[in-house]
Curated annotation (Swiss-Prot):
One of its GO terms (biological process) is ribosomal small subunit biogenesis. It comes from Lactococcus lactis subsp. lactis (strain IL1403). This is Small ribosomal subunit protein uS4. Gene3D superfamilies: Ribosomal Protein S4 Delta 41, Chain A, domain 1, RNA-binding S4 domain. The lineage of its organism: Bacteria, Bacillati, Bacillota, Bacilli, Lactobacillales. Part of the 30S ribosomal subunit. Contacts protein S5. The interaction surface between S4 and S5 is involved in control of translational fidelity. SUPFAM superfamilies: Alpha-L RNA-binding motif.
Length: 203
């Protein structure tokens, strides 16, 4: 299954989350596209609930099913902690996500583009792989030739607050993943246990 590249508002409304981060997609119509009103919801089966939760998280990070599943498999191989939380942590360690968390991009999709286009450095070296796993203490910065890219400067200006597990220097356009996040610091609307149940049945 390929990565979804259609309008983000459709998936935002379908799964009740804001993929843009602004919340505008679901502020006015908090029911799925195609429904004739907010009360016309069908009750999901157990499998349907698990699938919906999985899709909600997958679309939040903008991953293909293969990327998402492979990261889940990696989480099952981590010796400490629960599979669900380890999975959430690995998602957060993706370079495109850290770029987003630092406020260098307004969305994860935009962050992925910045990484792909070579605008981002990790410890001073250009990394153009969005799935690169950032470790605590590593410095994420904008390469010198990209420091005046309007979209990056606009994103930094628009960012009002950042997660407690990252630090950012707006003057240098660089930041650090200070530590791995705690569970209550990321995606509180997600029930990762449903995702674990989904993959346990499928694998």
């Amino acid at each position: 299954m390929s990565r979804y590249t259609g309008p983000s508002w459709k998936q935002s409304r379908r799964y009740g989350i804001s993929l843009s981060g602004s919340g505008k997609e679901i502020a006015r119509r908090n029911y799925v596209p195609g429904q004739h009103g907010p009360n016309n919801r069908s009750k999901l089966s157990e499998y349907g609930l698990q699938l919906a939760e999985k899709q909600k998280l997958r679309f939040s990070y903008g991953l293909s099913e293969r990327q998402f599943r492979n990261l889940y498999i990696a989480a099952t191989k981590v010796k400490e902690g629960t599979v669900g939380f380890n999975f959430m942590t690995l998602l957060e360690q993706r370079l495109d996500n850290v770029v987003f968390r630092l406020g260098l991009a307004t969305t994860r999709r935009q962050a992925r583009q910045f990484v792909n286009h070579g605008h981002i450095l990790v410890d001073g070296k250009r990394v153009d792989i969005p799935s690169f796993r950032v470790q605590p203490g590593q410095v994420i910065s904008v390469r010198e030739k990209s420091m005046k890219v309007p979209a990056i400067l606009e994103a930094v200006e628009a960012t009002k607050g950042r997660a407690n597990f990252v630090s950012f220097d707006a003057d240098k356009l660089e930041g650090t993943l200070v530590r791995l996040p705690e569970r209550d610091e990321i995606n509180p609307e997600i029930n990762e246990a449903l995702i674990v149940e989904f993959y346990n049945k499928m694998m």
